[in-house]
Amino acid sequence: MLAAAAPALAGWSSSVDAGSLAVSSATLAAPTGVAAAQGACTPRQRTSLTVVVTWAATSSPGATGYTVLRGTRATGPFTAEGTVSGISTTSWTDATGQLRFTTTYYYVVESTVQSWTSQNSATASVTTPASRTCA
């Protein structure tokens, strides 16, 4: 007999009937209002580049966190760069050390619950500065 486990999210259910699998599911909502901005610049010179990504919390009550993805094209592909635990935390700082000067980066955020993810949020973009000098 085949069994399926569904996340503990309102509206998600699974059942097994005579060897067949019937699953009904709710949609895990992506976060909204995603924005990306250059991180703080220390006085006189940047020692590294950072980007701060913010969003509004998902409307899905069973979500447990977020995955932040980054790409160099608005249409992707996007690579997971960070995770955030808890749905009330709605920001993440990209301090991965992989950012380059004078480059536009695109970010999307997904809501998560267990191994399930929502669709991507709308895309936010930011262009890193041209030099190490702080404005």
Q: What positions do the PLM features span?
A:
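Short, polar/proline-rich extracytoplasmic segments that appear immediately after membrane translocation
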Residues: M1-A36, A40-C41
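Short, conserved beta-strand segments of beta-strand-rich sandwich/propeller modules, principally
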Residues: P7, G65, T104-V108
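Beta-strand-rich extracellular modules
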Residues: S13, T58, E110-Q114
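Extracellular fibronectin type III
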Residues: V16-V23, T112-A135
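Short acidic/proline- and small/hydrophobic-mixed sequence motifs that coincide with surface turns
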Residues: A18, A63-T64
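Conserved aromatic anchor
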Residues: R44-A63, D94
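Recognizes extended acidic, P/S/T-rich segments that occur
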Residues: G65-R100
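Beta-strand-rich modules
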Residues: W92-N120
